Every structure is written in structure tokens, then in C-alpha cells.
Amino acid sequence: MGPLSAPPCTQRITWKGLLLTALLLNFWNLPTTAQVTIEAEPTKVSKGKDVLLLVHNLPQNLAGYIWYKGQMKDLYHYITSYVVDGQIIIYGPAYSGRETVYSNASLLIQNVTREDAGSYTLHIVKRGDGTRGETGHFTFTLYLETPKPSISSSNLYPREDMEAVSLTCDPETPDASYLWWMNGQSLPMTHSLQLSKNKRTLFLFGVTKYTAGPYECEIRNPVSASRSDPVTLNLLPKLPKPYITINNLNPRENKDVLAFTCEPKSENYTYIWWLNGQSLPVSPRVKRPIENRILILPSVTRNETGPYQCEIQDRYGGIRSYPVTLNVLYGPDLPRIYPSFTYYHSGENLYLSCFADSNPPAEYSWTINGKFQLSGQKLFIPQITTKHSGLYACSVRNSATGMESSKSMTVKVSAPSGTGHLPGLNPL
């Protein structure tokens, strides 16, 4: 700190004596052009330390001065005042017992606390030459000593070149900056090493032996700096991405035997099979050799298309294959004919459609009384007559499965004398 004038031999008066002093100071409260400046020593203030608010450019013929906490010049914010005549010091409501005022108007605050940070106002008055009081303001920020940081990791045991890891510097500290070190060197930013916006979190993408550490983080503010203990990631051996081979991706429902094989083969891995994201349950229908690398399904249904995955595991964890989905061939099922009306009147339009569940989609054809009419799912005959009565059949065929099926219905057409078809319906 700079040189100080020794504190005067003073009379110490409580804030209640302020009223008399205020009357004295206000007597000389006239305009002035003098410029008072205030600076802090040290310039960066930390908790528990001392700070001196050092005043420069004091006017001549000083009558006295008043210090306030904040920028409001009122009794509530009044810390202390000094009257040159009589070297009188008066303490106000904002005085904490840690402030020392000097004859050069400087204010020493000892053992600074959080509550001390902020703005201070100095009001100075002159006497006798027609000048008036002058006000100076100063604000300081309190910095805490940085704590010793520690590094937390999303995963201390990542798979080599496979898994991402985030390292976070704890604790989160206000008014502080974060620095990272790897192998004792300032951290280089690459595509595999990225920092969060506030630099508190470090992201590592695809950790290798060259980026496993050790890592250190540092918390720094204007008054202190602290560095963490080193943290090194423990790389686990890289697992190969498994894949599935299969003897038939287009099996026929309830006919073809399927064999799934999980590659690559290794005695060091355990194999697990998954169906629709669930571990494949033990079932009489599912056969697995002892090593479990091969999965055999004696038959498959349309509800077992998958996806299928296999997983290889070592003692540290596992990795799954890409999913494989089967194209199960089935059908055609027994077709259905819509609508199911069987009675019509002459002059009405006949419109029938046929549907059968099938993969791939079935081929459709229509016959009337055993005589081929047309191919397709829909049959339309405008203004039917009694001659259109007979047995209507829809035949379906799946060329992939080699299966066929058919459905028939009897249609009766009444003579023109009636109106509207009968209400009775014959469900198929």
C-alpha cells in the first residue's frame, strides 16, 4: 500500500453526533471543479484480506469528509466522517468496526467480507473560499480464494477409440476461469478434444492411448489459482463391432429353418442374442449351440421378423451388432369378400372387393359360376340382371410361397318388379 498519514488523535463520536457535524459541513457546501479520484490497494480484493481506498487530488483547505457505503448519501449508509477542526471522527450506522479512516481521507477496510464488496461514496467539503463539497465514487469486486478443484468423469474406463468421455472441473466457481492441462501441457484443441462454452467441461471423442491423460484442471481468478490432482483414463481393450450372417433373409413362414451366426468368432467373448430390443428368451423353438454364437430357429412366423441383434461381451462390457430384419414370406390367408350382401335387385350396381393377408402381396382373380371374369382385387358390374345370379369366387395366389386360397359367395338377383335389396345379410 502507498504511504498513509497516521490516524489522528481523535475524539470518537457515535453517529448521533452526526447532526451537529452535518450542520458544520453543510455551511461550506458550495460548487467546486476539483476532481477527486479513488483507487484500491491492492487493485484485486480477496476475502479475508485488507483493502485501502486511497484518495487522490484532495482539495486545499479541507474542512472534512464523509464516507458512505453505496451511492446513497443518507444516514442509513453513513460509515464515518472526519472533521479537520478538532480532528473529530464520527461513526455511523454502517460502521462495522473494521474501518480505519485517515487524515488524507483514505479508508482502510480490514478482514474484508462479502458484504463489504460494492460501491463506496466519499463526500469532501472545503471551507472559506466559496467552494462546495465534492463527491467521489469507487466500486470494488470481492474475489474468493479459489478452492482446490477436482475432476469428475462420465466414464473412467472408456473403450479405446470407441467411447466419448466428458471431464468436468468441480466446483463451479463464480468470477473464475478454467484451464485444462494434458500431460503437463496446455491442452490443444482438436476435433477429438472440445471444451464447453465456459471451459469447465472437456469433451473427448474416441479416447486413444494418446489422449488418455493424465488431465489436470485449474481454477483461476484475479487473486488466486488452484490446480487439481491429475486424472488418467483407464482404457479398455477395443471390441470389434459384431455382425450377423444368416442362411436366409427371406424365409417362408413355418417352413424354413434359419441359422444366425454372430461374427467374429473368439473364445474370449460371450455371445448374447436380442429380438426387438429384448434379450431372446429360452424357448423350445430356439436352439443355440453351447457357445451361443449360432442361433437356430426351426421355423419362423410373420411376427418374428425382428430386428435381431447379437452382442459380444468381455468382462468389462459389450457391444451390439447392427440390427437385421427378416422378410418373412407368408400367405395368402383365406380371402375376405366385401360387402357381404347376397341379395340384389335388377338394375343395381354390383361392386365387390377381395383381400387376403400375404407377403408378398397376393395375385387376385374372379370367377362367376366357375368361369374366369378378370384379374385384380375388385369386381364391378353395372346394372345387374337376374342373369348375374350365381357363385362368385375370389382366388388368391402367392408366387413366392406357392400357396393358393379362395373364397366364394352366392349372389341372387331378383326380378325388376322389386325395389331395393332385402335387408338380410349373409356374413361370409
Swiss-Prot record:
The alphabetized list of GO BP terms reads: defense response; female pregnancy
- Ig-like C2-type domain: from which residue to which, for each copy? 147-234, 240-327, 335-410
In which residues does the motif Cell attachment site occur? 127-129
Domain of life assignment: Eukaryota
Q: Does the keyword Secreted apply?
A: yes
Position of the signal peptide: 1-34
Primary residence: secreted
PROSITE patterns from the UniProt entry: IG_LIKE
A GO cellular component annotation here is: extracellular region
Q: Give the UniProt keywords, A-Z.
A: Disulfide bond, Glycoprotein, Immunoglobulin domain, Repeat, Secreted, Signal
Q: Which cysteine residues pair off into disulfide bonds?
A: C169-C217, C262-C310, C354-C394
Keyword Iron-sulfur attached: no
Glycosylated residues are N104, N111, N268, N303
- Can you give the residue ranges of the Ig-like V-type domain? 35-144
One of the Pfam families matching this protein, by short name: V-set
Q: Which InterPro entries match?
A: CEA_cell_adhesion, Ig-like_dom, Ig-like_dom_sf, Ig-like_fold, Ig_sub, Ig_sub2, Ig_V-set
> In which family does this protein belong, per the annotation?
Belongs to the immunoglobulin superfamily. CEA family.
Which PANTHER family does UniProt cross-reference here? CARCINOEMBRYONIC ANTIGEN-RELATED CELL ADHESION MOLECULE 19, PREGNANCY-SPECIFIC BETA-1-GLYCOPROTEIN 3
What protein name applies here?
Pregnancy-specific beta-1-glycoprotein 3
